Structures are given as structure tokens and as C-alpha cells.
Swiss-Prot record:
Protein name: DNA polymerase II large subunit
Organism: Halobacterium salinarum (strain ATCC 700922 / JCM 11081 / NRC-1) (Halobacterium halobium)
Pfam families xrefs: PolC_DP2_cat, PolC_DP2_central, PolC_DP2_N
Keyword DNA-binding applies: yes
Alphabetic keyword roster: Autocatalytic cleavage, DNA replication, DNA-binding, DNA-directed DNA polymerase, Exonuclease, Hydrolase, Multifunctional enzyme, Nuclease, Nucleotidyltransferase, Protein splicing, Transferase
Length: 1370
């Protein structure tokens, strides 16, 4: 690491230490759930290992060893530290061995999986029959997640520690040896193993392994032969033991041998017999797999079929996937590969990287501001979506104005000046994509535009002194004069400069001939700007359309067309300066070519390249995002008030609430955790004793026998008498009025300090610990809200940036120098605000909205410190300039880890800029649309339908939330339930909280089971796998043949048909499946294959299921979709207010919570997507030429440097070069028109009006798609919802399946009303009819709308009172 990088990280960590000191002092004085900060700091992987294990000294020793040896060798080296007491504090030999084994597994799994904690139960030192002692390691099912190598090395580590401690080897009895063989076979047949050892191999390992492999029982099956053995506690298979023996030692024997050879104290010569395969050779099974092989499915990519015919120019094949599911208000900017659409240009700007696309800011304005910085688009290639960033060094759009001018617009100011006069957008400009995007998406390279950076290399290769030309004050290589361009082309036999290379591939040969004739017949008029004058052509339709297609700037009059700077055009047409045509006929090859490129090269005096062979279609996805993250509904305090606060959850209302006149106002029964004071034995729900002020502990008392219990090492609480699981949750009556006014007094505030204080109806955490209400009072005062973990958060669309200027971040060079920025990217001293500097890896740029929110949060934190904790203010900020240099947390989704960042400046865009390494990649994992799921609908009826049907019927694009990757998420109001399963295998019925629809990836995984079930999901879909002692969560890509997947036998609830169908789906009737779980009805099915398949769909679907996050899909229990949004939070807010005690006690409840904090980003430990960013300052000529051959990205990997090449070197945090400049990262609209326009009708009208202007868009097709994909599904879904709706009390929120006859609520007497109204059902009907007529849609579409209109009339129009005339009966 460079000294400057080390200094940077030390600065961050010093600030973090200072904040920790204050936060620790605050927590000791308050009433938080614990007196300590609950977010441990991890600088690196070594810290994560120490934090996950809680063993002091591990991190420092791991760092010492990390640079000297491999992690496997380091794991073995650490054994001596544990044995000698240099690491850890253990009194027994068993403790030392256990610490060494856990640390080895944690080190080998980088501290990110549960195996070191949950996969190793304990270590014991027991007696052999000869009086010596041996070591027994007790493994559990979660050891599977460690992988075979870590499993095997954990045994080696245990043996190494055993030898160093002088403990003898394990000496198994004969019946124990045979028991192991029977047990492994039983486990393999019941649950499945990646490698199935022969009986002889199992007995051989058991006999020779110097450590006893033991473990807890898994499942209900029992061995038949060797039962009730003295030294084995169970007759059931020990799943952890079986995994370590089979998938660890037997499968990874060659790897283990590498390390045993280097250890004097340990000798495992018997491994060679395993490796040679001589064990049990006489009765070997021919089908036994190779123990030393590891195989992974090969991903062949999903490159579209492209045109490489010798008689056609090479082209990437058009794809219209991005157009499907088009919705109203989000415009199309180009149909697939259509002329006039975005022109592909390769390169990377400094504000460009992961899943982003650069466009000219003039384009953003001329597309009626629908594109703003951070706006997501759905795109044709290379990926499926991209965030828009402004790049003004590429070409902007070409437009035709109402006055007849055709102009290139390369200045945002010009775009604003002319946009009201634009009659047609002939070309939307260039579209910058970096090579790394093609690598990341495994997409073949599409033919590159002929851009100046390629032409310069061609000129250099042709023999020109390019450096001398660069140095000349009279030459601009990117924008030369026409005479210079033509001279270079002829003198050096180089292609014509791109500035004068027109889009000859966009016209055919007949148009070429007609234009050549027109130019030869033209004349010139004198001009003050050009000695050659202005070329004047006769105005004909053919000439006009051809010039527009070529993007030749000109002025159209009624009778003539006038072209300035016309000579390059004439020479390209084979016409001389004197307007003489030099050719009569074209060759057969040129005449038959699909476009005019060959014709041009045949008649011109220079070579002409294809200017823009690749057009990229795209449309708007979701708008950019910058807003606070709130719970739904937003709350200020995590204090429960039940239903007493009404629909607004108003604490003041709850404080006054009394069900009856005889009740005391504010006394509300709520579910909270029972806690006890260890000093005075007072029972309370508070974290601190109200009598003596001591910290309280959760009190677990059995409701049946009254026994009091305490949690074991795993956190589980079990009654010592009854054996039942216990919790500390009780219903207590709390005086909300007293709490409310006590909170006001505690912080010295009055009720007029805020408009409303909102609490929660109930707590979702395991111990139901309420937050001090005083914190909520101060949040309400400063208008910030609480997230589920007690923190205040702000969401922003993430965009990458690798270099910035102080000026564009609204800060000064002086402020940057205070942050440690001393040099610009060229190594010059930083003295001016406009110098470009490389952004540090953990520095972030906040949106204006985020900055304002952070200021309010800082004021809240300062008030909290001074008024609640009695400490000095920490921030004391006056304006947003004071935020520069302050530390924040950035939350990386799905990691439960926070990354420390530092505020470097601000942006007017609604995004958050940061280094690509700071932005964590998102995951989305979902189902194929044809996956059948069981669900009970709002009316109580059971269905077994494709998940697409369930989701689409309930998804409203207008109200659904859309994330950074275009996924639509719709919260459900109605009661939809699905069969679900708990971690213990208990079947249950759970509510569907939301439905979601996601862009499909290029590849899916097809999982097939032994019973013939098939499930197609995304590779990272959250599956459920039976481990032998419960159900674990695992990515689909981690499944292997033999894995046991849970499957139900019945649908909970009513419905014989449903149960019967599901039973027939789950069972084949001939082979009984295994039952597991105490009393559960779940059975398992064995995986036989997991294969990658190319995706043939545009979207995948998922559900959000309460509590368990599982559902039945194609007859298997599996997980739902995961996903969270990136956010930032102020450092001190997170340190003081975050508590694990507030997190929901459900699967996923700990996701998106800062359970650990990384103070340093290690590039080697982040997602590979961030490594696929090219960092060169130019692409080589060979790369551009390869694109014209549709090469695979890997074929040119040696030509371009990716960030991954610097990982692990001193340069891993620096050297992020870029090929294209951006004058300001805030250029273009600050907000998308989608967010500034009012109603959906306004947005849709703007969408269709833009389609009229764009040459690259067919407006009729857009109108058709809006009707087909948005309006009709919406009308149909709303009508269905109307017919199945519930009714709801307007006062208390009570729901009824049917309207009470009285019309009044049975609970509170309030008015009961419909939840779906006529206006929301037919809101798009009139608009859809108008659009269909105005844009001349197909008769089929119009007839569908007419039928829908009649259905609506039949439901909502009352014809019973319609007055009839006599003519109605004649």
C-alpha cells in the first residue's frame, strides 16, 4: 500500500475512534438496550475473523501471517499461538483446540459465513480404552457452508493442536468403525453428499484419523446395526460428522496432503492410499466419482445471434426485450438497432463504470428532460439496464428545427435555446459504454463507431507524426478543418476523419446515386464564411431525406437546400470541387451491397469507415432517486402503542386513549419483553431499572412450570423442566401518557416542538425491546424518522466516479487539501478549484437532498447528546460546508455490513457519487414466470397458478416502487397467503406482504429433483436446504446433486382439492419420502442436477412473505426474492442509536443492518463486478478492429487493463484512468421530467409527443405497447380487485370480507367503506381509447378496449333506473 493510502485510512480510523469514544460514553449514560456501541469495527478480513469469533488477538496475528503464507498455512501456524496461550484465553486443552479449529474455519471462509460459529458445536477431550486421552470435535450441519477444504483442514488443525498438547490419538473400537460406515451411508441416502465414499473408505478414515469426528444427531432416521454405542450419543446420523468425513477428508485428501508433508508433529501417511484409490479396490463401484475433482458449470454467455454473413456488414442482432412491459409515462428513446438511435461508442469517462451509460447532456435536454443524471434506462445491450451519466466529450444529437435548419447540438446551452423549436430529432447522439460492461455481461463486442480516438491511431499507423500534430497550435485532431481532414486522408492513405464521415451505412445505393446526381447538378453561392461558398441543391424529397439520414448539417428552404462546408460530402460522392462527377457506374459488388459504404469507398479519393454501425435501442426505466428511507408508515420512535394511536400511530392520541369512561387514559396493553434487574429484582420492560438504574436482563420464565432459564451459548433458551423453548415476551399494561410526558421532560421539550410524534403498533424483535421514547421526540422535532434498527437513513441512486474537481462538488481546493488531497491526476500541486483529482476510495458525494437530511440528522444527534445523554454536542454544524470531512456509513445490501465513508462534496443531481469500490453490487434472485405457486387469494380461494399470474394481477406500475435495477415492488393491502415453512421444518401459513417483478438475467439455473420436480430460478436465488438439523438458506448456485430440498405434503387450511393436487405433485406414490421436523408434515426431495440454462424470458417474479420468507414453488419449499437499497447514515447516529435488539425476529430481519463495520475497503474482498472496470487512458487500435469482427470480450482481454489487474498491488487504490473527459458531472437536467410532470396523463402525453419527434421511434408501436402492457392489464387487474375487495373501517382500520349490514364497524362503530373505488378502476379507460384513436392503433387493440369499456359499464352503470322511451320497445 502506498504511504498516501495508509495516511488516508489512518485519518478515517482516527475520526472513527473519536466518534466511538463519544458514542461509548453516551451509551453508558442512556437507556439503550446495552451500554456499549453494538457495531464492531473490522478493518479487514482479519478483523472480521476476530469479530465473528470474539477471540482477542486473532486479527493482529492473522495480519502478521497474511503476507508470509497462504491462509491454509496461516491457519496451521495459528495453532501454536493457541496452544502456547499467545492468542485466546483458555484454561483447558479442549478450549485451546476449539479456539484453533474455529479460527481456522473462520480464516478459510474470510469471516463471512456462519460455519465457524454454528458448524462447530464444541471440542472435548475424552478417554481411550487404554487410559490415554483423545480429542473429539463435534460438528453440526452448518459446517457445510465452509466447503470441503475448510472442513478437512479443521480436522488437521485439531490433530496438530492435539499433537502439540501431547494428547494421544483417537483409538476407535471395532463397532464404532462399522457404525461410521453405516452412518455415512444412511446420511447419504437420506440427505445426500457431494461425494459418497465407499464403506471401505469410511472405515479406513475412521480407523486412521487421529481425531474423533463427532456431532449432533440430525433427522429422525436411525441406524439399524450399530446402535446404543457407549461413546456415540445418538443412534441417528451425525450430519456434520458425515460432511467432514466425506466431503472434507475423503474428497479433499490431495489438498490435505500438501500441508501434512510440512508438519513435523503430524503425519498422515494413510492419505496416500485414499489418493491412490486403492482402498476397497476389490469391491469398488465403477460409478464412484473422482475424489479429487471439483467441477463447475460453464457459463457460455448469451450473446445474441449476429450477422456475420460475407455478403452483409457484421452487425449485432437487434433485440426488443427492453421494450416489453412498456408503461405509460416512460418514453422510448430508440427502437431496436434503428437508425437515429443511440450510436455505440467505446470508452470510459471519470463518472462512468458499473452498469452506467454516458450520453451527451444536450441529448438529455432535447429528450424533453426525461433523462437526468442517474435515470435508469432499459437497454438493448450490453446489459439490460444502465444508469445515465453526462459526458460532454462525445457527440450530441442532430435535430431538424422548425425553420428548416439541420444542426448538430454539442452544447447544453444550445440545446436549451433550440428545444422549443425542434421539429424532429434525427439522431440522439452517442452512447458511451466501457469495455468492462461487455466483460461483466459476457456479451460479444458490437461494432464500434469510428471515433476520433480510433482515427488518430489509424493516422499514426499510416505514418503521420501524430505527436507533432498534437503539439501544433494550428491543429485540432478531434475537430480539424475540412481541408486538413481531406489532406491527411489523401497524403497518408488514411481514412477520412470521423467529423466528415457521414452515415453512409444508413442509406442505400439508390439514394447514394440520387444524391451524387443532385450534388453534380448543384451550384454554389458566395459566402462570407467559406471561400468555396455554399452548396445549393434542388429541394426534393429524396435529397432531403438522404441528407437527413447522413446527418449532414444544412438549411432547407422551400425550393433549395443549402449546405456549408460541403467539399468532404462532394468528394465522398465522387464529385470534384468544380462539381464534376468522376464516375459513371458502380461495380456489381458496390451496387449490390446493402448500404452505400462500398459505393463511397469506390468513388471517393480516400477510404471511408463505417461511422456508426451499432445503434442501441433503449427506453426509460425508473427515475433517479434521492430520498429518506422510512418505515411504512414512517415513525419517529420504536415504542409500541398498539391500536391506540389510530391509523396515524399518534403517540399523543394514544396517551389520551381510553376504551371506556372507566378506564385510565393512556393505559394500553402491549407486547413487550419482560426484564429483571439483577440488583433489586424489579421486573420491567425497560433496559434500565426504573428503581435503581442498573442495567436489566431478559427474564425467561416457563409459563407451564414457572422455571426460570437462561440462554445457552447459542442464544437458545429452553425450560430445564419441560424442554420447551422460551421467550421473555409478555403482555404488559403501559401508561403511554406517563411515558410520553416523561420523554418530553427527559429532553426538555414541549409538545409544540413538533407536529406529531409517531410510534409503532407493535415490536417485531425477539425480545421486543422498546426504544426510549425521548429519542423519538427529538427525531420528530428535527423532522427525521427511524428505520427498523433505530437509525436515520437516506437512500440515493448510486453512481460511480473516479476523479472530480473541487468546484463541481461545491467545495474549494483548500477544503480538499484539508481532506488530504495534495495533487491532481497529473501530479501537479492542488491549487485551483478546477483541477482534477482522483477520488479516494471511501469518499462520497452527497446529493443536495442528502446533505440537507444529514444536517437535520446532525442537529438531532447533537440534541440527543446534550439533552438526553448530558454530553457535549458532537457536530455543531451551521451549514452544509461543515459536513465536508464528516464520516458516514454506507450500507452495502445483503452483507449486513456498513462501510465507513467520508463526505467530500455535494451534487445537484439526485444521486450519490462514490468510487466504484464503495458501491456494493445488488443481488436480485427470483423465479421463472411459469413457476407454479400455491396461494390463497383475498376472497379465501386457493389457487395453483404461475407466479406471473399472481404478481401481474396485483402489480400497479403507477404505484409500485422501482429500485436501481428496474425491479418493480408492490406492497399488498389485501390478504394473500401462501404455504410456508419455518427453519425447524414446521409448515405454516404466511401473508404475502409484497409482489415484485424483475428484469431477467441472461442465465437461469434449472434445478431437477429425484421425484421429477423442476424449478428454474436465478443463480443467486435463495433456496432452502435440509441440513439434518434444520433448514438452511443457500444460493441456488451452491446446490449440488444429493442435496435435500424440503417439500410439503398439504396446503395448510381448507380445500380438499388443493391438498389433493399438492399431494399428487409432491409424491410419486411408490417411494415414501423422509419426514423431518417435530410434528411437521414437510418431506424432502433429492437434487439430481443443477444446470445453467439461457434465459428465454424478459422478467422473473417473486413474493415477499412475512416471517419465514418461504413459499411453495413447483412443489418445493424455497425462499423469496432478496433486495435492499443502498443508503447512507450519519456515523454518530449509527453508533449511538443502532441496536440489534430492535431488529425483526424473522428471516432477513438482520439484513441491511450494520452488524459489523468495515473501516477499510479491501479491493480483493469486494464483488467482482467492481473489478470489471477498465482503467486505461485509451483503447488500442486492435480493440476497435476486433469489435468489427464481433469478437468475444475475452479475446481482447490482453489489450485493455481492468481494475482487477491491480488488486493486491500498491496501485490497487489508484490509477483509475479514463478515456473520455466530462467537464462537469452535474451537467444535464437535475431532475427527470418524469418526476416534475404532474399526473400520469401528463407524463404519457409527453412520452408520446417525444415519440413523434424521434426518428428512431415508431410512435404507433409505443402507443400500442402502452395500451397492451400498461392500460389493459391495469384495467383488468383493477376490475378483478374491485370484485374481490375487502371493506375497511375508516376509523380503526378493521377489515371485513363483506360489508356489515349496518354499514358500521363492529369494533368501534365507525364508518365502513370500500377499499377499491370506481375511479381507481376505470381511471385509464378514456385515455386508452383516445390514444388508440389518435395514434391509429390496430383494430384488435381498439376492440379489446371496447370490450373492456362494456365490462366496466356493466359493473358501474345502474340501468335499473334508466328512463326508457317508447322507441326502446319498438
Amino acid at each position: 500500500m502506498r504511504p498516501t493510502d495508509e495516511t488516508y485510512f489512518e485519518t478515517l480510523e482516527t475520526g472513527l475512534d473519536d466518534a466511538f469514544e463519544v458514542a461509548e460514553a453516551a451509551r453508558e449514560r442512556g437507556e439503550d438496550p446495552t451500554p456499549n456501541v453494538e457495531i464492531p469495527v473490522a478493518k479487514d478480513m482479519a478483523d472480521r475473523v476476530e469479530n465473528i469469533l470474539g477471540i482477542d488477538g486473532v486479527a493482529e496475528r492473522v495480519r502478521d501471517l497474511d503476507g508470509e503464507m497462504s491462509r491454509e498455512e496461516a491457519a496451521l501456524e495459528l495453532v501454536a499461538d493457541f496452544v502456547d496461550g499467545r492468542v485466546g484465553d483458555y484454561d483447558t486443552d479442549a478450549g485451546k483446540i476449539e479456539g484453533a479449529v474455529r479460527t481456522a474455519v473462520a480464516l478459510l471462509t474470510e469471516g463471512v459465513v456462519a460455519a465457524p460459529i454454528e458448524g462447530i458445536d464444541r471440542v472435548e477431550v475424552n478417554d481411550n480404552d487404554d487410559g490415554t486421552q483423545y480429542v473429539a470435535v463435534y460438528y453440526a450441519g452448518p459446517i457445510r457452508s465452509a466447503g470441503g477444504t475448510a472442513q478437512a483442514l479443521s480436522v488437521l488443525v485439531a490433530d496438530y493442536a492435539r499433537a502439540m498438547l501431547g494428547i494421544d490419538a483417537f483409538k476407535p473400537r471395532d463397532d464404532e468403525i462399522e457404525r461410521y460406515a453405516e452412518e455415512v451411508d444412511l446420511y447419504d441416502s437420506e440427505t445426500g453428499l457431494q461425494y459418497s465414499p465407499k464403506d471401505a473408505e469410511t472405515t479406513f478414515i475412521t480407523e486412521h484419523c487421529p481425531v474423533m469426528l463427532d456431532g449432533e444427531a440430525t433427522g429422525n432416521e436411525e441406524v439399524d446395526g450399530f446402535r446404543d454405542l457407549e461413546r456415540i450419543d445418538t443412534n441417528s446420523p451425525r450430519g456434520g460428522m458425515c460432511l467432514v468425513l466425506a466431503e472434507g477428508i475423503a474428497l479433499k485428501a490431495p489438498k490435505i496432503q500438501r500441508y501434512t508433508r510440512n508438519l513435523d508433529e503430524v503425519a498422515w501417511p494413510w492419505l496416500q492410499d485414499l489418493i491412490d484409490g486403492t482402498i476397497g479396490a476389490d469391491d469398488a463401484d465403477e460409478d464412484t466419482p473422482d475424489a479429487g475433482s471439483d467441477s463447475d458449470a460453464t457459463d457460455e454467455g448469451d450473446a445474441p445471434s449476429a450477422s456475420t454473413d460475407a455478403e452483409e456488414p457484421p452487425r449485432a442482432a437487434p433485440s426488443d426485450k427492453f421494450l416489453r412491459d412498456l408503461i405509460a409515462g416512460r418514453p422510448v428513446f430508440g427502437h431496436p438497432s434503428k437508425n437515429g438511435g443511440f450510436r455505440l461508442r467505446y470508452g470510459r469517462a471519470r463518472n462512468h463504470g458499473n452498469a452506467t451509460a454516458g450520453v451527451h447532456p444536450a441529448t438529455m435536454h432535447l429528450l424533453d428532460d426525461f433523462l437526468a443524471t442517474g435515470t435508469q434506462i432499459k437497454t438493448e445491450r450490453p446489459g439490460k439496464a444502465a444508469g445515465i451519466v453526462p459526458v460532454d466529450s462525445i457527440e450530441g444529437p442532430t435535430v431538424k428545427l422548425a425553420n428548416g435548419d439541420v444542426r448538430h447540438i454539442n452544447d447544453p446551452a444550445d440545446a436549451l435555446d433550440v428545444r422549443n423549436g425542434v421539429a424532429e430529432i434525427l439522431d440522439v447522439g452517442e452512447y458511451l459504454v466501457n469495455y468492462g460492461e461487455f466483460v461483466e455481461n459476457n456479451h460479444e463486442l458490437a461494432p464500434a463507431s469510428y471515433a476520433p480516438e480510433w482515427w488518430i491511431q489509424d493516422l499514426d499507423a499510416a505514418g503521420a507524426d501524430v505527436q507533432a500534430l498534437r503539439d501544433s497550435p494550428y491543429v485540432d485532431l478531434t475537430a480539424p478543418t475540412a481541408d486538413q481532414a481531406m489532406a491527411w486522408a489523401t497524403d497518408y492513405d488514411a481514412p477520412l476523419h470521423p467529423a466528415y464521415t457521414y452515415l453512409w451505412h444508413d442509406i442505400d445505393v439508390e439514394q447514394f446515386r440520387a444524391l451524387a446526381d443532385a450534388v453534380a447538378d448543384a451550384h454554389t453561392d458566395a459566402s462570407d464564411d467559406d471561400d468555396r461558398g455554399v452548396l445549393v441543391l434542388d429541394h426534393t424529397t429524396t435529397v432531403r431525406e438522404t441528407l437527413e439520414a447522413l446527418l449532414v448539417t444544412h438549411h432547407q428552404g422551400d425550393d433549395t437546400i443549402r449546405v456549408d462546408d460541403w467539399l468532404p460530402l462532394a468528394r465522398s460522392l465522387g464529385v470534384t470541387e468544380s462539381l464534376d462527377r468522376e464516375w459513371e457506374t458502380l461495380s456489381e459488388a458496390a451496387a449490390e451491397w446493402p448500404n452505400a459504404v462500398r459505393a463511397v469507398n469506390e468513388v471517393a479519393p480516400f477510404s471511408v469507415q463505417e461511422r456508426a454501425p451499432t445503434r442501441i435501442g433503449n427506453r426509460m426505466g425508473r427515475p433517479e432517486k434521492s430520498e429518506s428511507r422510512d418505515l411504512s408508515p414512517a415513525v419517529h420512535t420504536l415504542f409500541p402503542i398498539g391500536d391506540a394511536g389510530g391509523s396515524q400511530r399518534d403517540v399523543a392520541d394514544a396517551a389520551r386513549y381510553a376504551p371506556d369512561m372507566s378506564d385510565t387514559p393512556g393505559e394500553i396493553p402491549v407486547r413487550v419483553g419482560d426484564r429483571v434487574c439483577p440488583s433489586c429484582d424489579e421486573h420491567t420492560y425497560e433496559s434500565r431499572c426504573p428503581d435503581c438504574g442498573d442495567w436489566t436482563d431478559p427474564h425467561y420464565e416457563c409459563r407451564d412450570c414457572g422455571a426460570v432459564a437462561t440462554p445457552d451459548e447459542s442464544g437458545r433458551v429452553e425450560c430445564p423442566n419441560c424442554g420447551r423453548d422460551l421467550d421473555n415476551v409478555t403482555t404488559q399494561v403501559i401508561d403511554i401518557n406517563d411515558e410520553y410526558h416523561g420523554a418530553l421532560r427527559a429532553v426538555g421539550e414541549r409538545e409544540n416542538a413538533f407536529d406529531q410524534l409517531k410510534g409503532v403498533k407493535g415490536l417485531l424483535s425477539a425480545e421486543k425491546t422498546p426504544e426510549p421514547m425521548a429519542k423519538g421526540v427529538l427525531r420528530a422535532k428535527h423532522d427525521v424518522t427511524a428505520f427498523k434498527d433505530g437509525t436515520v437513513r437516506y437512500d440515493m441512486t448510486d453512481l460511480p466516479v473516479t476523479a472530480v474537481t473541487p468546484a463541481e462538488l461545491d467545495v474549494t481546493a483548500g477544503q480538499f487539501r484539508e481532506l488530504g488531497y495534495n495533487q491532481d491526476i497529473h501530479g501537479d500541486p492542488l491549487e485551483h478549484d478546477d483541477q482534477l483529482v482522483e477520488l479516494r476510495v471511501q469518499d462520497v458525494v452527497l446529493s443536495d437532498g442528502a446533505a440537507d437530511h444529514m444536517l437535520k440528522t446532525a442537529d438531532f444527534v447533537d440534541d440527543l447528546l446534550t439533552q438526553y445523554y448530558g454530553l457535549d454536542a458532537f457536530y455543531d454544524l451551521d451549514d452544509r460546508d461543515d459536513l465536508v470531512g464528516e464520516l458516514v456509513f454506507g450500507m452495502a445490501p445483503h452483507t449486513s455490513a456498513a462501510v465507513v465513508g467520508r463526505v467530500a462534496g455535494f451534487t445537484s443531481a439526485s444521486v450519490g457519487y462514490a468510487h466504484p469500490y464503495f458501491h456494493a453490487a445488488k443481488r436480485r434472485n427470483c423465479f421463472h414466470p411459469e413457476t407454479n405457486v400455491w396461494f390463497r387469494d383475498e376472497s379465501g380461494e386457493w389457487h395453483h397458478d404461475p407466479i406471473e399470474t399472481l404478481v401481474e394481477a396485483r402489480l400497479d406500475p403507477d404505484t409500485a416502487d422501482e429500485d436501481d435495477f428496474g425491479a418493480l415492488v408492490q406492497a399488498l393491502d389485501g390478504d394473500v397467503f401462501v404455504p410456508s415453512v419455518t427453519e425447524d421444518g414446521e409448515e405454516t401459513l404466511q401473508r404475502v406482504e409484497a409482489v415484485s417483478k424483475h428484469p431477467a438475467p441472461d442465465h437461469l439455473l434449472a434445478v431437477e429433483t429425484k421425484r421429477g420436480r423442476e424449478l428454474t430460478v436465478t443463480p443467486d436465488h435463495s433456496m432452502r436446504r435440509w441440513t439434518g438439523d434444520g433448514i438452511e438458506r443457500v444460493d441456488a448456485r451452491e446446490l449440488t446433486a444429493g442435496d435435500a430440498l424440503p417439500a410439503p405434503t398439504q396446503v395448510p387450511g381448507d380445500g380438499e382439492t388443493a391438498t389433493s393436487e399438492l399431494r399428487s405433485e409432491s409424491l410419486d406414490g411408490t417411494h415414501p419420502q423422509r419426514r423431518f421436523g417435530d410434528g411437521g408434515s414437510v418431506r424432502t426431495d433429492e437434487v439430481v442436477s443443477v444446470e445453467p440454462v439461457r434465459s428465454s424470458v424478459d422478467h422473473t417474479y417473486s413474493l415477499t412473505v412475512a416471517e419465514t420468507n418461504t413459499l411453495v414453488a413447483n412443489g418445493l419449499f424455497t425462499g423469496q426474492c432478496d433486495g435492499d437499497e443502498d443508503c447512507v447514515m450519519l456515523l454518530m447516529d449509527g453508533l449511538i442509536n443502532f441496536s440489534k435488539s430492535y431488529l425483526p425476529d424473522k428471516r432477513g430481519g438482520r439484513m441491511d443492518a450494520p452488524l459489523v463495520m468495515s473501516s477499510r475497503i479491501d479491493p480483493a474482498e469486494i464483488d467482482d463486478e467492481a473489478h470489471n472496470i477498465d482503467i486505461d487512458r485509451e483503447y488500442p487500435r486492435e480493440f476497435y478492429e476486433a469489435t468489427r469482427e464481433l469478437a468475444d470480450p475475452e479475446d481482447v482481454a490482453d489489450l485493455i487493463t481492468l481494475a482487477e489487474s491491480t488488486v493486491g498491488t500498491d496501485e490497487e487504490y489508484t490509477g483509475f484512468g479514463h478515456t473520455h473527459a466530462t467537464s462537469n458531472i452535474h451537467l444535464g437536467p437535475s431532475l427527470s421530467a418524469y418526476k416534475t410532470l404532474g399526473s400520469m396523463m401528463d407524463k404519457m402525453d409527453a412520452q408520446l409527443e417525444l415519440a413523434r419527434k424521434l426518428r428512431s421511434v415508431a410512435e404507433t408501436d409505443v402507443a400500442e405497447r402502452v395500451i397492451e402492457y400498461h392500460f389493459l392489464p391495469d384495467l383488468i387487474g383493477n376490475l378483478r380487485a374491485f370484485s374481490r375487495q375487502e371493506t375497511r373501517c375508516l376509523d380503526c382500520g378493521e377489515k371485513y370480507r363483506r360489508m356489515p349490514l349496518s354499514g358500521d364497524c363492529r369494533e368501534c362503530g365507525g364508518r365502513v367503506n370500500l377499499t377499491v373505488h370506481e375511479g381507481s378502476v376505470n381511471k385509464y379507460m378514456d385515455t386508452a381509447m383516445r390514444v388508440a384513436t389518435e395514434y391509429d392503433c390496430r383494430e384488435y387493440t381498439k376492440q379489446r378496449l371496447e370490450i373492456m369499456d362494456r365490462r366496466l359499464e356493466s359493473v358501474f352503470e345502474d340501468d335499473t333506473n334508466k328512463q326508457s322511451g317508447i322507441s326502446d320497445f319498438m
